[in-house]
Amino acid sequence: MRYPFWRLAVFLAACVAPVWWLYQAWIFALGPDPGKVLVEDFGLATLVMLLITMSMTPLQRLTGWPGWIVVRRQLGLWCFAYVVLHMTMYALFILGLDLGQLGVELVKRPYIIVGALAFLGLLALAVTSNRYSQRRLGARWKKLHRLIYVILGLGLLHMFWIVRADLKEWALYAGIGAFLLLLRIPMITRRIPRLGGSAGTGSKKVQNNG
């Protein structure tokens, strides 16, 4: 395993937010509606983790350090873990585990459908984020994992629909997402010398395994 301490550091850092929020809920420090706070916090954390995951490839190309790619899959799985926690909090505190209420919620809040589609996309990526799936799917694996761009769009739309009264924070995340997408365009990449240059043999070895 390459960069074990770096992997461990990323793992511990990703644990901090959920552990802290759950602890805050345990000691009743999240205000009068802790369930709503947890749903919102885990939802936002999912979007942030998705953006962090998408930034690994540009960072590797910019710096030439393969460590960014090494933790990309780990970060992607953390993104999925966050969205599972987001949906779990929603089922517990908003629905009260009453699936009959879900139909009412879907009619009143159609942005939930958008969020559910994003979840299904993340589920597909999480299930196939292993070497067996890479070998099994071949060239189709990369095409499947381009779903991350669609998922980002769905996540931003989901957030926009919820916070449209105050779009300042949304605009920040949307701007970061747009910037990361621009860095994927070959014409843009070639205009930035470091991004267009060779990333080194070490990074090539971990490109598909990170």
Curated annotation (Swiss-Prot):
One annotated GO biological process: protein repair
Cofactor section: FMN; heme b
UniProt membrane topology term: Multi-pass membrane protein
UniProt GO MF annotations: electron transfer activity; FMN binding; heme binding; metal ion binding; oxidoreductase activity, acting on diphenols and related substances as donors
Keyword Metal-binding part of the UniProt annotation: yes
Subcellular location: Cell inner membrane
The keyword Nuclease appears for this protein: no
InterPro entries with a match to the protein in the record: Fe3_Rdtase_TM_dom, MsrQ-like
Main location, first listed in the record: membrane
Cofactor remark: Binds 1 FMN per subunit. Binds 1 heme b (iron(II)-protoporphyrin IX) group per subunit.
Keywords for this protein: Cell inner membrane, Cell membrane, Electron transport, Flavoprotein, FMN, Heme, Iron, Membrane, Metal-binding, Transmembrane, Transmembrane helix, Transport
Spans through the membrane: 8-28, 37-57, 75-95, 110-130, 147-167, 169-189
One protein family per Pfam: Ferric_reduct
GO CC annotations, alphabetized: plasma membrane
Quaternary organization: Heterodimer of a catalytic subunit (MsrP) and a heme-binding subunit (MsrQ).
Function: Part of the MsrPQ system that repairs oxidized periplasmic proteins containing methionine sulfoxide residues (Met-O), using respiratory chain electrons. Thus protects these proteins from oxidative-stress damage caused by reactive species of oxygen and chlorine generated by the host defense mechanisms. MsrPQ is essential for the maintenance of envelope integrity under bleach stress, rescuing a wide series of structurally unrelated periplasmic proteins from methionine oxidation.
PANTHER family: PROTEIN-METHIONINE-SULFOXIDE REDUCTASE HEME-BINDING SUBUNIT MSRQ
Family classification: Belongs to the MsrQ family.
Protein name stated in the entry: Protein-methionine-sulfoxide reductase heme-binding subunit MsrQ
Organism of origin: Pseudomonas savastanoi pv. phaseolicola (strain 1448A / Race 6) (Pseudomonas syringae pv. phaseolicola (strain 1448A / Race 6))
Lineage, opening ranks: Bacteria, Pseudomonadati, Pseudomonadota, Gammaproteobacteria, Pseudomonadales
